């Protein structure tokens, strides 16, 4: 429910109008003056009525009155004479109240009230305008509208000052029979009195008319019924309404809410107001809930039964009165007032804008009017357009306003400014923008500037504010800062050029001759290249180009239309008398009619005025001949700046011109008093002072004083349009003629020859040619703005929508209809509102659906004409795409449903009706031509629809969305409409009053009774969870009820397992693969399935690094992908590795055999030594020594003098060879002996000396000191030791090579295993992706099938939209899932790759470690080796 708001809609009525005053009345169409008319306004300000003695009252709805202004003198001389007889003639204009009224902007009627005194006229005029300024009365409730109609009945009395019963019967005739209405009147005592009107036959009637009455004298005169005004009170009228039109649908609702009782209790009423009538999204503090205290106040207002009031109950009648009261409006009532922040920069607002404001009809051949500017401004428009051209003929030297070269009538520029001045701030105080499309010469531009300054005065903003200079980065001033200011939008010179020319003009009173006649290239923005428009759509229509857009050559829509064959003109400088001299003299002499030189064949305008208030002398024209001679070769119409070059007087010595299809349109013939250069073309010639008025027969103006050329009205139509098939009996264009004119039309761009004074008046609305969004962003000039045709705007919106939105955050843009809309139709403004375009200009004279949308949108915020754009369209740190279909950050999507229940007073005819509900917003939110009720035949009074709700499931941006309610008859004619903003809409059961197609109220407004549900949008799969969170008690209570029911059926609660919510099953089914959120190591450790490490297997390999011996691998299975580590032992068991080891062993055995052969060879080289006795004796003792040594080796080990026996099993000695070493007690020498083979090596000291040793028995001393023995030992020791070292080194090198090959093979095997592991991982992930796609496809098909089978979806469009929304949601979800799967695969691959690198790195470390160990062992053995010998 809405917060309490004091809605006081009643205006203040001054006593002179409330009690009535006497005026004399006349109108434009009458020729007589109605004297002593009693004029009054009712106490509620609904109607203005005048009563004349002996006549029926005339009642005028105040909602149809545009304004009351100071009147002029009457045109009819008889009326003027009578007014002079009744008062002072010099004060007639001041004593006159000129009231204009009408149901639309174009068909405006007027009447005049002449007061007895100037003071009375001034007071009543101000009182009427004060009533009109308030817009609250347009938003009253249905009860107040019934009161309004009751007031109309009581004021609309006949000559007997009673209410005709027929008016009451006619009220209900659209749904009820007359006898039934009459019976209800009689039941309520409203039958009235009967009387027979007297027949009055005027003697002045014609003979046939008198004979008609004579023939009917025998007929019975029909009796009439009338009712006293005092009898028909509002209470009785309400009872009559409820009796004739019982609200059965409200009664059904009441019975449902009351629980079959005759009243609503306080608790039920509170629950209804807080649950049904409240938007759940509202803040509880700003919009408090209803409590008992507010219910008591509510009952006092609407419940008439005192007992019910005391008991806190509400009856059915009281409930109906509440539903139809001001406390139950469809829109928050504070939205009617000024509720928006008006201190933001000007570009942050939508501005109500008009296109070609001067036109009252079609774009071609239409009528121009200055009066329509008043209606447009009074209707709330804040940006109006003025197409300014040089006047021709008698109006030469005066700027006019017309649609140039489109055969439209003209109005004076000065007259339009007066109308703007009088009405600019009559309804709204916020600034008005005048959009000039300037085609005038500099002299007329000077007049335009002077007219603006003189007429507007202080209202004109002639220079920027000091705190808001025209500098880069400076924001525009706010609407509050610009209150009651008029801004001019016109091209402007560059700053330095403007300053120079303006100083010269103010100093000398004129400009240089070159500046006067040449186009000025120093216009800001005109030297930049504009991007070509992409938007004509291939229609071939000439695109109208605004003054700040591209030239015609830059617009492809213009280029494609220029397929008209043009004939090259010839210049005839001979005047009417054939004198070339007079023609040449006209170049040197100023024209008598205003001093203008007309050169119609220039590509750009050279027409300039030399006569104005500040010029001291006339320029010398003799210097222009060379320029003119060149310009004469140009096309006469391509760049002509005249408004109507086609109506100039043809002068040619040749035969009369014949109209040609390929040439320009035929021209009017008129004589003129001045001479100029005459251009002759095929089918068209011009003369000096030919008229420029174009009036089509079908659009004859009603008032002469509203045209710049009224004298052309008759002769031009009758004589000069015959070439197009026009005649007196054919006042309108045929389709073929219109197409012909349209094909030959060529739009002329606005002039760049700007007068510095007019340029200096442009400030915050400086139009420039659009050069691109990046250029505009780089310049950062907020006061620059650009205009786009709807085609061009759609092109930019299609290509660069976010950039367009950002552009509109900083500066303004204006959108106008494309030139192909010759019927003045409109485009959908919502498209450009979505992009933040401020001035979306429409044709106000055409009240189509799109104009209704514009009027309905700007009806709020006090009707100021300014609406603050949503936050995301203003903040520079936010990015917004108007084509987005997903919710915007910070904006909560809404869900809206509308159920049309019934209607009241929809039509005054007994005809079938239906209701259509549409939504306009973002493209994804816009729903049109889908939701309509069934036709209820033969009842235009109170049809009951009771349709199923029209559901708008997901509204992405509620702030931009509006609802449109429209009622049509069975033939498709619109009966009423209403535009309501979604962000201000109230939920619950509401009555919606409808408006006319021009957004005006009716005397008895049609009303729709609807139920509106607004809440936060929740996806279907989460609705159950949201409901449970919103009301957990109800959710648990429902669960408990079901549990008790199952227990009653014998089912134990323990037998029921917990199951997931079916609403989330589909979502869970898609999301079943779990996501891993651990570290990368954990993620990889849980990945993979390993098998054998053999290279020929394609199964998964282990994915762990080479671990230390104490580290134990721990394989874990995740996502059905088991991982085991790669073990080196597994790799060593590979066939290739076993084969390599076998080859290594063979190589080693071969090397050892080779070494053994070498040892055997050395032993064979010393046979003589063994025969020596001493050696033999040594040998014998050595054998004994070996025998003893075996017994005592362990005991004597480590002794300084010891016998060491070792069995060598390594390389360097034969198997089973025993080596014995004998050392002296001092340790200085030793002798080595070896046995067990053919030869025995003996170990000696390093110097080759041996010491005598006692082995078993003492060694003879002489043997030890024997030189021969010593030399033999030394020689044998050296040879043998060298051989042993060489063998050891060869074996070491072989081991190194084998170790390297071994680890190379391990590396190769590991790489293959890693490759297989990676391949298995990819195959697994691909399988998961394939499974995911299959699951997603299955889900999409199942969801689409559910939607197709959903019986709650009524229309195909809704079903398609649901499927599209579902597909988009699924697509987004599927993309996210696939992204997660891809990220998971990427992480797995990255981690596996890292682990593979670690494994290879560890393998390299192990290789180097093994190599270092081998080298260390080899060095250690070398250090521990002793010299050995064979003896």
Curated annotation (Swiss-Prot):
Domain PI-PLC Y-box residue range list: 758-874
Disruption phenotype: Mutant worms are similar in size to the wild-type but animals are bloated with eggs due to defective egg laying with decreased body flexion and sluggish locomotion. They have defects in the posterior body contraction step of the defecation motor program and become sluggish in the presence of exogenous betaine. Animals are resistant to aldicarb, a carbamate insecticide. Simultaneous knockout of egl-8 and snf-3 results in uncoordinated, hypercontracted and paralyzed animals.
Gene: egl-8
Lineage top rank: taxon: Eukaryota
Enzymatic reactions: a 1,2-diacyl-sn-glycero-3-phospho-(1D-myo-inositol-4,5-bisphosphate) + H2O = 1D-myo-inositol 1,4,5-trisphosphate + a 1,2-diacyl-sn-glycerol + H(+)
Role noted for this protein: Mediates the production of the second messenger molecules diacylglycerol (DAG) and inositol 1,4,5-trisphosphate (IP3) which plays an important role in the regulation of intracellular signaling cascades. Required in the nervous system to modulate neuronal activity. Facilitates synaptic transmission at neuromuscular junctions by regulating the release of acetylcholine from the motor neurons and thus affecting locomotion. Plays a role in efficient egg laying and defecation. Involved in axon regeneration after injury.
Cofactors named for this entry: Ca(2+)
Coiled-coil stretches noted in the UniProt entry, renumbered to this chain: 1135-1166, 1288-1318, 1368-1402
GO cellular component entries: adherens junction; axon; perikaryon; plasma membrane; synapse
Compositional bias annotation for Low complexity: 572-586, 652-661, 668-692, 1204-1216
Domain C2: 877-1002
PROSITE patterns: C2 (PS50004), PIPLC_X_DOMAIN (PS50007), PIPLC_Y_DOMAIN (PS50008)
EC number: 3.1.4.11
Biological-process GO terms, alphabetical: chemotaxis; G protein-coupled dopamine receptor signaling pathway; lipid catabolic process; phosphatidylinositol metabolic process; phosphatidylinositol-mediated signaling; positive regulation of acetylcholine secretion, neurotransmission; positive regulation of axon regeneration; positive regulation of locomotion
Binding site for Ca(2+): 356, 385, 387, 437
Binding site for substrate: 489, 491, 787, 814
Acidic residues biased stretches: 543-556
Compositionally biased residues, Polar residues: 1074-1113
Localization in the cell: Perikaryon; Cell projection, Axon; Synapse; Cell junction, Adherens junction
Protein's UniProt name: 1-phosphatidylinositol 4,5-bisphosphate phosphodiesterase beta egl-8
Composition-biased stretches (Basic and acidic residues): 1150-1162
Annotated consequence of substituting residue 45 to D: In n2659; egg laying and defecation defects, and sluggish locomotion. Grows in the presence of aldicarb unlike the wild-type
InterPro entries given in the database record: C2_dom (IPR000008), C2_domain_sf (IPR035892), EF-hand-dom_pair (IPR011992), PI-PLC_fam (IPR001192), PLC-beta (IPR016280), PLC-beta_C_sf (IPR042531), PLC-beta_PH (IPR037862), PLC-like_Pdiesterase_TIM-brl (IPR017946)
Compositionally biased residues, Basic residues: 1191-1200
Lineage, opening ranks: Eukaryota, Metazoa, Ecdysozoa, Nematoda, Chromadorea
Positions of the PI-PLC X-box domain: 340-491
Catalytic residue list: 355, 403
The keyword Calcium appears for this protein: yes
């Amino acid at each position: 429910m809405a917060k309490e708001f004091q809605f006081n809609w009643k205006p203040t009525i001054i006593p002179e109008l409330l009690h009535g005053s006497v005026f004399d009345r006349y109108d434009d169409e009458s020729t007589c003056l109605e004297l002593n008319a009693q004029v009054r306004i009712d106490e509620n300000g609904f109607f203005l009525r005048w009563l004349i003695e002996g006549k029926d009252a005339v009642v005028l709805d105040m909602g149809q009155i545009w304004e009351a202004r100071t009147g002029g003198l009457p045109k009819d001389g008889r009326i003027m004479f009578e007014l002079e007889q009744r008062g002072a003639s010099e004060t007639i204009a001041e004593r006159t109240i000129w009231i204009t009224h009408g149901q639309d902007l174009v068909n405006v009627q007027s009447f005049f009230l002449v007061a007895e005194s100037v003071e009375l006229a001034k007071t009543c005029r101000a009182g009427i305008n004060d009533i009109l300024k308030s817009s609250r009365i347009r938003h009253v409730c249905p009860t107040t509208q019934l009161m309004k109609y009751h007031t109309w009945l009581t004021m609309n009395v006949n000559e007997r000052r009673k209410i005709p019963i027929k008016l009451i019967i006619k009220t209900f005739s659209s749904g009820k029979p007359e006898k039934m209405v009459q019976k209800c009147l009689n039941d309520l005592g409203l039958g009235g009195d009967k009387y027979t009107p007297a027949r009055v036959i005027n003697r002045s009637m014609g003979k046939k008319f008198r004979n008609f009455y004579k023939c009917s004298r025998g007929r019975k005169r029909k009796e009439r019924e009338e009712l006293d005004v005092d009898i028909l009170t509002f209470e009785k009228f309400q009872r009559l309404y409820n009796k004739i039109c019982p609200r059965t649908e409200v009664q059904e609702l009441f019975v449902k809410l009351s629980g079959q009782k005759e009243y609503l209790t306080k608790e039920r009423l509170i629950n209804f107001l807080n649950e049904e009538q409240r938007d759940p999204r509202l803040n509880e503090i700003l919009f408090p809930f209803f409590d008992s205290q507010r219910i008591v106040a509510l009952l006092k207002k609407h419940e008439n039964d005192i007992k019910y009031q005391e008991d806190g109950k509400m009856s059915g009648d009281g409930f109906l009165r509440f539903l139809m009261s001001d406390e139950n409006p469809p829109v928050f009532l504070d939205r009617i007032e000024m509720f928006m922040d008006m201190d933001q920069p000007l570009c942050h607002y939508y501005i109500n804008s008009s296109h070609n404001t001067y036109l009252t009809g079609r774009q071609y051949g239409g009528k121009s009017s200055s009066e329509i500017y008043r209606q447009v401004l009074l209707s709330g428009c804040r940006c109006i357009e003025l197409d300014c051209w040089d006047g021709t003929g008698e109006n030469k030297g005066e700027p006019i306003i017309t649609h140039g070269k489109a055969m439209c009538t003209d109005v004076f520029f000065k007259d339009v400014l007066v109308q703007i001045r009088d009405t600019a701030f009559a309804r709204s105080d916020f600034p008005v923008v005048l959009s000039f499309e300037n085609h005038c010469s500099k002299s007329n531009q000077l007049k335009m500037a002077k007219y603006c300054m003189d007429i507007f005065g202080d209202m004109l903003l002639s220079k920027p504010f000091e705190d808001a200079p025209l500098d880069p980065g400076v924001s525009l001033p706010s609407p509050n800062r610009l209150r009651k200011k008029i801004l001019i939008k016109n091209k402007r010179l560059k700053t330095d050029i403007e300053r120079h020319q303006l100083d010269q003009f103010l100093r000398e009173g004129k400009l240089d001759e070159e500046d006067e006649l040449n186009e000025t290239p120093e216009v800001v923005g005109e030297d930049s290249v504009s991007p070509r428009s992409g938007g004509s759509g291939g229609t071939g229509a000439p695109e109208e180009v605004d003054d700040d857009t591209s030239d015609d050559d830059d617009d492809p829509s213009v280029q494609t239309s220029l397929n008209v064959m043009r004939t090259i003109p010839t210049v005839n400088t001979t005047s009417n008398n054939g004198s070339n001299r007079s023609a040449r003299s006209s170049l040197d002499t100023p024209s008598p009619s205003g001093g203008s030189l007309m050169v119609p064949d220039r590509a750009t305008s050279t027409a300039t005025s030399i006569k104005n208030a500040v010029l001291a002398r006339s320029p010398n024209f003799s210097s222009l001949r060379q320029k003119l001679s060149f310009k004469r070769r140009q096309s006469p119409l391509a760049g002509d700046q005249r408004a109507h070059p086609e109506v100039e007087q043809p002068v040619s010595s040749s035969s009369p011109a014949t109209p040609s299809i390929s040439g320009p349109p035929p021209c009017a013939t008129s004589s003129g008093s001045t001479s100029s250069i005459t251009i002759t073309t095929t089918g068209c010639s011009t003369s000096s002072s030919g008229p420029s008025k174009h009036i089509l027969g079908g659009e004859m103006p009603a008032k002469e004083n509203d045209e710049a050329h009224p004298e052309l009205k008759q002769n031009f139509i009758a004589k000069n349009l015959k070439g197009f098939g026009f005649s007196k009996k054919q006042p309108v264009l045929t389709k073929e003629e219109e197409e012909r004119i349209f094909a030959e039309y060529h739009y002329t761009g606005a002039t760049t020859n700007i007068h510095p004074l007019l340029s200096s008046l442009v400030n915050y609305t400086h139009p420039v040619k659009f050069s691109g969004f990046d250029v505009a962003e780089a310049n950062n000039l907020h006061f620059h703005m650009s205009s786009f045709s709807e085609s061009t705007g759609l092109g930019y919106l299609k290509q660069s929508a976010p950039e367009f939105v950002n552009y509109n955050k900083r500066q303004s843009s204006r959108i106008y209809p494309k030139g192909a809309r010759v019927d003045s139709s409109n485009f959908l403004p919502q498209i450009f509102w979505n992009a933040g375009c401020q001035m979306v200009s429409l044709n106000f004279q055409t009240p189509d659906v799109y104009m209704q949308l514009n009027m309905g949108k700007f009806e709020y915020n006090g009707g100021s004409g300014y609406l603050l754009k949503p936050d995301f369209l203003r903040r520079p740190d936010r990015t917004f795409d108007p084509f987005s279909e997903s919710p915007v950050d910070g904006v909560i999507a809404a869900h809206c449903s509308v159920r049309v229940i019934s209607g009241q007073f929809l039509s005054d005819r007994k005809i079938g009706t239906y209701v259509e509900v549409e939504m306009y917003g973002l493209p994804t939110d816009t729903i049109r031509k889908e939701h309509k009720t069934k036709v209820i035949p033969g009842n235009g009074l109170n049809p009951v629809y009771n349709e199923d709700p029209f559901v708008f499931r997901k509204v992405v941006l509620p702030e931009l969305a509006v609802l449109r309610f429209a009622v049509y008859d069975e033939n498709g004619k619109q009966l009423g409409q209403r535009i309501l903003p979604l962000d201000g809409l109230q939920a619950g059961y509401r009555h919606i009053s409808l408006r006319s197609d021009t957004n005006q109220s009716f005397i008895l407004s049609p009303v729709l009774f609807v139920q509106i549900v607004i809440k936060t949008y929740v996806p279907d799969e989460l609705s159950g969870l949201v409901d449970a969170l919103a009301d957990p008690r109800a959710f648990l209570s429902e669960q408990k009820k079901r549990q008790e029911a199952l227990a009653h059926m014998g089912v134990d609660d323990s037998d029921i397992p917990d199951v997931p919510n079916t609403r989330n099953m589909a979502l869970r089914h898609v999301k079943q693969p779990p996501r891993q959120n651990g570290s990368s190591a954990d993620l990889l450790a849980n990945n993979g399935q390993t098998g054998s490490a053999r290279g020929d297997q394609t199964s998964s390999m282990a994915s762990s690094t080479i671990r230390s011996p104490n580290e134990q691998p721990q394989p874990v299975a995740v996502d059905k992908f088991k991982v085991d580590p790669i073990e080196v032992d597994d790799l060593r068991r590979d066939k290739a590795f076993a084969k390599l080891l076998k080859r290594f062993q063979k190589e080693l055995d071969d090397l050892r055999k080779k070494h053994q052969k070498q040892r055997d060879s050395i032993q064979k080289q010393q046979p003589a030594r063994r025969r020596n006795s001493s050696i033999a004796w040594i040998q014998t003792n050595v054998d004994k020594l070996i025998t003893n040594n075996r017994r005592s080796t362990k005991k004597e080990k480590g002794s300084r003098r010891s016998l060491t026996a070792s069995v060598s099993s390594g390389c360097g000695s034969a198997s089973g060879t025993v080596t014995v070493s004998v050392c002296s007690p001092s340790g200085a020498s030793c002798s080595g002996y070896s046995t067990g083979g053919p030869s025995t090596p003996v170990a000696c000291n390093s110097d080759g000396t041996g010491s005598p040793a006692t082995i078993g028995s003492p060694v003879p001393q002489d043997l030890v000191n024997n030189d021969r023995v010593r030399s033999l030992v030394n020689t044998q020791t050296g040879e043998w030791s060298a051989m042993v070292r060489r063998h050891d080194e060869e074996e070491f090198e072989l081991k190194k090579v084998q170790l390297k090959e071994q680890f190379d093979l391990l590396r190769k095997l590991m790489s293959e295993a890693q490759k297989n592991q990676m391949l298995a991982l990819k195959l697994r992930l691909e399988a998961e992706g394939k499974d995911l796609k299959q699951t997603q496809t299955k889900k999409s098909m199942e969801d689409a099938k559910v939607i197709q089978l959903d019986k709650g979806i009524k229309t195909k469009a809704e079903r398609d939209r649901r499927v599209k929304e579902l597909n988009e949601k699924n697509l987004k979800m599927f993309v996210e899932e696939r992204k997660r799967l891809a990220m998971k695969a990427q992480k797995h691959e990255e981690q596996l790759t890292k682990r593979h690198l670690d494994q290879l790195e560890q393998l390299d470390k192990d290789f180097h470690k093994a190599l270092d160990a081998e080298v260390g062992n080899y060095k250690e053995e070398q250090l521990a080796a002793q010299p050995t010998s064979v003896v």
